[in-house]
A protein has these predicted regions:
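Outer-membrane beta-barrel initiation region
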Residues: 2, 30-118, 162, 172, ...
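Transmembrane beta-barrel strands of outer-membrane/channel proteins
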Residues: 46-50, 78-84, 97, 108-127, ...
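Outer-membrane beta-barrel transmembrane strands
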Residues: 50, 54, 134-168, 190, ...
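Outer-membrane beta-barrel translocator domains and adjoining extracellular loop/strand segments
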Residues: 73-75, 92-95, 120-128, 173-180, ...
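Extracellular loop and loop/strand-boundary signature of outer-membrane beta-barrel proteins
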Residues: 81-83, 132-137, 182-188, 224-230, ...
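Outer-membrane beta-barrel translocator/channel fold
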Residues: 83-93, 109-145, 262-278, 356-360, ...
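Outer-membrane beta-barrel "beta-signal"
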Residues: 198-199, 342-346, 351, 366-377
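Extracytoplasmic gating/loop element in the C-terminal half of outer-membrane beta-barrel translocons
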Residues: 246-328
């Protein structure tokens, strides 16, 4: 998959850090009319998700919010989340903060990310790499720690620029039976540290982050790492992703959602910074990080239909089609990897914020089941 080096600080109902169903156990602010609405509040979270390689992910966390004197948005938002994956047998922890000062619209962000779930497979480099051996051959046990301070500045309504330094450290275990060990050594394996700069431009006009029916989103991000710490040759990475939504009815009874993304690395990039395609976030129906290259692209389409407005919530069906590939300098390939499938979705109390989707995607290699809050995009 395209691993997000820049992990945006998400509002908790659709938790980008846990990638799970975030169930708020305390009520949300329904209005700002009473004095109680402006008091600091701490909300506990509980989550669960499923994908074929990582399997069941169980998570919990809290979000703490403070307001200025009768002012929106909040002056402080703190988030702490932890999750454990039963299939990968490892964890993910995220601590994040958003701080705003009175007056200027600038947001000061801080994020600490520690995880063993960012890179779990390695099939070699290439768009037609072999995947016929037992799954244990391709497994990777890597722990990553990311420290990411940044400043976000609004450029226009719904258009934001984020930039700052970053520090990243990874430790990859040398398991002798894996492809990573038998075909290596690979630059970046073992202990590897890197520092650099990052920037991101984000345009978001969607009407809902978890289950959009209208609007669009465009994100362009870049990172650059000089020859410092473990980095021998400077390298950079750029990625872009765009999605749009068209619906019929109000509220929507049918929504066509399409998304496309691409990424590329330049210079002496370590193996964990290559472009990966395949898995729950790019091309479903394939293993996580199934294909690795210097450049990559993917596209997704979903047709989401409302089937019934039951008393407890909306029930619907979804059809999907995914496609993607990677490019490497020493390989000539015209293959695009595709998958298709469908599933069900449910919006509790008729609120799209409360949407849960369960889909199956079939590719030439396997069929995968995916459970998540909202939709993929």
């Amino acid at each position: 998959m395209f691993r997000p080096v820049l992990r945006p600080i998400a509002w908790i109902r659709a938790s980008a850090a846990l990638d799970v169903l975030a169930l708020t156990l305390a009520g949300e602010v329904c209005g700002q009319g009473s004095s109680d609405a402006w008091r600091p509040r701490t909300t506990p979270l509980l989550g669960i998700s499923y994908s074929p390689d990582i399997e069941l992910v169980i998570g919990a966390g809290i979000v703490h919010t403070r307001y200025g004197f009768r002012a929106l948005p909040p002056s402080t938002r703190l988030r702490a989340e932890a999750a454990y994956a039963t299939g990968a047998r490892t964890y993910r922890v995220d601590i994040a903060a958003e701080l705003r000062r009175p007056g200027p619209p600038t947001v000061y962000n801080f994020e600490l990310h520690a995880s063993g779930l960012d890179l779990t497979r390695f099939y070699g480099v290439g768009n037609e790499s072999d995947g016929s051996q037992p799954d244990s051959v391709y497994r990777v046990r890597q722990q990553q720690v990311l420290l990411l301070p940044s400043i976000t500045t609004p450029l226009a309504p719904r258009l934001r620029l984020t930039a700052g330094p970053l520090l990243k450290y990874s430790h990859t275990r040398d398991d002798p039976w894996t492809l990573l060990a038998t075909t290596g050594p690979y630059y970046g394996a073992g202990d590897f540290g890197q520092v650099g700069l990052h920037t991101r431009i984000d345009l978001d006009t969607r009407d809902n982050g978890a289950a959009a029916a209208h609007g669009a989103r465009l994100t362009v991000a870049g990172q650059w790492y000089p020859a410092v710490w473990s980095v021998v040759d400077p390298f950079g990475r750029i990625s872009a992703q765009a999605s749009t939504y068209a619906s019929v009815g109000d509220p929507a009874t049918a929504t066509l959602a399409v998304r496309a993304g691409a990424a590329a690395v330049s210079g002496g990039a370590p193996f964990q910074e290559l472009v990966y395609v395949g898995g729950a976030t790019t091309v479903r129906g394939y293993a996580e990080q199934r294909f690795a290259g210097r450049q990559g692209a993917y596209a997704n389409a979903e047709l989401r239909l409302l089937a019934d407005r039951a008393s407890v919530g909306d029930i619907g069906i979804v059809g999907l089609a995914d496609v993607g590939r990677v490019w490497t300098p020493d390989e000539s390939s015209d293959v695009w990897h595709a998958a298709a499938g469908g599933g069900l979705w449910f919006a509790w109390r008729h609120r799209r914020d409360n949407t849960v989707s369960i889909v199956a995607a079939r590719s030439p290699e396997r069929t995968g089941i995916y459970v998540r809050v909202g939709f993929l995009f």
